[in-house]
Amino acid sequence: MKLNNIELSFDNFASEMAKLKNEKHFDYLVTIIGEDFGEEGLGCIYILENTQTNERCSVKTIAKKVDGSDVIPTVINLWKVADLLEREVFDFVGIKFLGHPDMRRLFLRTDFQGHPLRKDFDMSPEANQFPCTDEPEDDFTVEYSLSADGHLVETQKRRFDDDDYVVNIGPNHPSTHGVLRLQTVIDGETVKRIYPHLGYIHRGIEKMWEGMTYPQTLALTDRLNYLSAMMHRHALVGVIEEAMGIELSDRIRYIRTIMDELQRIDSHLLYLGCTAQDLGALTAFLYCMRDREHVLNVMEETTGGRLIQNYYRIGGLQADIDPNFVQNVKTLCKYLRPMIQEYLDVFGDNVITHNRLEGVGPMNLEDCINYAVTGPAGRASGWKNDTRKRHPYDMYDKVEWKEITLTGCDSMDRYYVHIQELYQSLDII
């Protein structure tokens, strides 16, 4: 995948970004990368995508020094996902985004000192005392702007009104699908606003990588998300191999593709099972967990691991596949097809399931793109965003399979997308 690289100055950054969004139709903000460029100063790289043509571009800009602070105009008015992305950059790099309505830390504690992804960050234990007290709480946020004479203005705002009914969810949610805390403002059963608190299991992997060789970094990719360990490592070894000009054999590419799809089945089965569990359907949950065990057993025979496999290497694999791998995968695929229909019979097509999922969590196509809701959730709103189709790698452009999209834009169709993608993964394998 090639990018068109653009560099913008501080003065024309806001207007040129608006042109990229409104005239060039780069409507999807993939990510914002905060960076310490050394003598150049602090800055950001924005990755943008045109969802109609799949064209991508990168935009680099250097922050301006104002009253000792590094500032860049916000793009939250163009892409709503910038709300969290800019807060992440502020948290780790320290760039303040002018006009952002909620410039608080996102991952680290509010009383954390410094910004750890800066090159001059002091890593010594003396400067990073482990806190033994509760994190300070406040209801205020900060917005930064420039005054008429060019000085930085800090404005404090309250997040909650006096009559807001605030309910805290987490940080230890009963379902523990991900450790986070949500401050919600509710009106009856309607959620009016949500303020997320992330980072409870943030381990500073980016900072650790700064002092590692490329082979040493691989062990940490599997731990980014144990439900997609293969894919995370695949992404890293893929860019390293491309940069080094390493050509892989078709055998390695086939094995990686099959392993990725086995991992996808593993992940989707857990999603389907936990959805059933959250609605009280324990039978459907146990069915999914039972079949997920079969998938993990097949991967474990070759990789030696069930969740953390450490299988892909730069330029190849840790080892060849197990002698029984091919036969076991064929047996697994034959077994799973009728089981998927069983999930629908027991849970997915149940009237109670439809009553609880239809119309819940509505998010239309425009909102999905604006908030960068990708994956099966975005495809359930009609967004054709599957990287395997849009930017194919390994053997995904060599096999026939369908990209599943639905238009219900609710939790029910998100469930159905996962179901249909199980069939597609079996077809790819």
PLM region descriptions:
Residues 1-190, 267, 352-360, 367, ...:
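Terminal low-complexity/charged segments
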Residues 110, 146-177, 185-429:
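Active-site bordering "gate/hinge" segments
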